[in-house]
Amino acid sequence: MKNILILGAGKSSTVLIKYLSNLSEKFNLKIKVAALDVSYFFSNPLNNVLPIELDINNLDQLKRNMMNVSLVVSMLPNFMHFKIAKICSNIGKNLITASYLTSEIKKLHNDFLKKNAFLLMEMGLDPGIDHMSAMKIIHKLGRDYNLKSFESYTGGLLTPNSKSYNPWNYKFTWNSKNVILAGSQGAIYLENKKKVKLSYDEIFNKINLIEIPQLGVFEGYANRDSIKYLDIYNLKNIDTLFRGTLRNRGFSSAWNLLVKLGLTDDKTSVNKSLNMTYNNFLKSKVFKNKKEDIQKLISSKFNIK
């Protein structure tokens, strides 16, 4: 029997855990789920799934739970991955995450090789499946084509007939904080052999309209650093390389207002905000407690009539 340790028991993890549980008999799997709160899996037991209460910051306990597994899957927030990767590289455990590869973790590459173990990051939807589909196309074209431009767009969107409609036409299906902070690091891509850099304030203003057959027109905005994939995709001589995020029409302009209001800023806080109404919180954070009606303040700030 192959043992898999999954770190984290949040929304995305639960989908993966159920999927592996359904395949556990076929592939002879035993899945350990370790997190601070695993109560869901005690009250909703799954086949071949063992929940373990674990404080990820307890490195000794974490290491003990890794010792008898073939694979570690970290579904934790990305800032926690380095400590997980460090332990795995020391004891020779295979590790998979869905998060972007950082320069810090990349330095552990040789340590994993020495222990005959692998580290696979960017194994989610975006980044992940988009890489696979990109390389599938590039490899299929092969050397018979001289690629001048390569653009890819990915977005976790509601199906057109979804009953979960809301004004944003969007639903959180993964870490909500990552959605809120999307674009905050800016973006860089290659356009006509020139590097284009966008700041946080610019990203949602510069969108591309993408038409998808039978689905309609969507918005695409620049996603982080596309330049670093020139070598990875073996597209060193290409003129344009752009990786984008896909959203429904109207999302970007509306989200840009939240950015300009400072509501996506996680670096500053408002004193006693838990006791405030949303109205008072907005006035306190954005408008320094001005007495005017909040709708009038926002309309005036952005010249909305």
List each language-model region with its residue ranges.
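NAD(P)-binding Rossmann-fold cofactor-contacting core
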Residues: L29-S43
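C-terminal catalytic/substrate-binding lobe primarily of soluble NAD(P)-dependent oxidoreductases
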Residues: K140-K305
